[in-house]
Amino acid sequence: MAKGLGKGINALFNQVDLSEETVEEIKIADLRPNPYQPRKHFDDEALAELKESVLQHGILQPLIVRKSLKGYDIVAGERRFRAAKLAGLDTVPAIVRELSEALMREIALLENLQREDLSPLEEAQAYDSLLKHLDLTQEQLAKRLGKSRPHIANHLRLLTLPENIQQLIAEGTLSMGHGRTLLGLKNKNKLEPLVQKVIAEQLNVRQLEQLIQQLNQNVPRETKKKEPVKDAVLKERESYLQNYFGTTVNIKRQKKKGKIEIEFFSNEDLDRILELLSERES
């Protein structure tokens, strides 16, 4: 299955014969969502807009479904299904396909990853599911999805956060940048109060990075030595490296030289960073 990752969905959407013989009108009451759907939240405003489009133009692209014991499972097109329900339709156009459980899972994940904007946490869960069920490495998955290896790795790291913090990211209360930065806190007992401080004071990612650096060094904010103000170029380079390595990076410039500090918090984290460095060299 892993060998053909990505090809199944292209064949399903791009090579389907949309003649009258292949498209059926299926009752909405007989349809149920794909159990492997990674998307947990559907934007109400976006669905309302899609509903208006359905009312004016109908459903332009048929759903892909699979026959089940109690009706049909939606393989692809759950947003169209939900919009059709909101529009009060009784039936929707659909193409029935015979698909295995494994292929259903793959298609559900790939459709969302390729066609819609998942939340960072939903995207991470989709990557995790593909890695586990298709027996792929992060590098293999990145190549087949056309993503970078750091992009996959940085999303997956969110899943190591406590569930309540993952939920805050899923809701949009915290950003992915906040989540990745929180992973750098050494004393995990300080994690919960720190999260509450971020929310209460609406700290941005950069402010959180500075606060975590102080906490990790166990230096009170009031007595911390004031560091030289960095120019815009250094800040830009620093931000780029932090995004690439998924951890705190500090660039220090002196008179005729400088140094780059990359933080890691375990042997596994160090191996991850070294792997990213070796990829840049190859």
Curated annotation (Swiss-Prot):
The record's SMART domains line, in alphabetical order, gives: ParB (SM00470)
GO MF entries: DNA binding
- Pfam families according to UniProt: HTH_ParB (PF17762), ParB_dimer (PF23552), ParBc (PF02195)
Q: Which residues bind DNA?
A: 139-158
Q: Which GO terms describe its biological process?
A: chromosome segregation; positive regulation of sporulation resulting in formation of a cellular spore; sporulation resulting in formation of a cellular spore
Q: Give the record's keywords alphabetically.
A: Chromosome partition, Cytoplasm, DNA-binding, Sporulation
Q: What is this protein called?
A: Stage 0 sporulation protein J
